[in-house]
Amino acid sequence: TERSLVYETDPIRRTRAELAVIDCAYGADPRSAEVLRFDFLTRMAALLAAGKPVLLPVPKYGRGLEQLALLCRARPKAAVFGDAQFLYQLAWAQTDRFWLAPNARDSLTRVQVQPLTGIPDSGVCFLSDPQLKSPGTRKFADAFIAAGGSVVMTGTPERGSYSASLMQDGKMEYLRYPVHQNETEYRRLLRENHFSRPIPYHTPDFSAKREILF
């Protein structure tokens, strides 16, 4: 999405192309990025107010830093923990800031994230394995749940994944965090450019002819 809170983006405007493959992963979901972020913060506030820790399984790179920046801005006193990969990602962002949006550079430099070495009494915990594919992260998530903590999925669970099974069992909550476009944003991008043949990508809600002939 062009509306990242952390990453620098180059908006596509007045561009001509014969073929444009455009992200539309959220399809018919009408909620804007602003609404999704508000819903995310509202629910996270309620979970943290309960006095138990919250586990956020996130990709090795990407939305984790966005969620960190948003949560630290909204709840600056909340303790934050991250596994080794998350700390590596944060250290990279703090030193190589070329990819960061100007308003995120200072906030990510000042933020304090403690190593996630166990299950804390409270706070936000980032775990760099969204589908919980490794035995270690599965074991950690199970122990987290057994200790009374909340586990929140913010991306799309893969079919057959451990995260999907936790959601089916009611042990993992789902809060979509915006990193892709919906159909409204996809159509807006079309209006602001000149694409002869646009193809909406990554959505089951509607389709377009996908055969490409040269």
State what each model feature region is.
Residues 11-15, 36-37, 70-75, 95-98, ...:
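Short, solvent-exposed amphipathic alpha-helical segments in soluble enzyme
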Residues 1-6, 105-113, 134:
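Short gly/ser/thr-rich secondary-structure transition/capping motifs
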Residues 70-129:
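Accessory terminal helices/loops
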Residues 110-214:
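C-terminal regulatory/interaction regions
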Residues 5-8, 30-31, 88-94, 161-164, ...:
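Short, charged, surface-exposed secondary-structure boundary motifs
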Residues 65-70, 90, 136, 207-209:
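Phosphate- and divalent-cation-binding pockets in alpha/beta enzyme and binding domains
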Residues 1-64, 69-79:
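His/Asp/Glu-rich metal-coordinating catalytic cores
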Residues 21, 77-88, 151-155, 199-202:
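Short internal beta-strands
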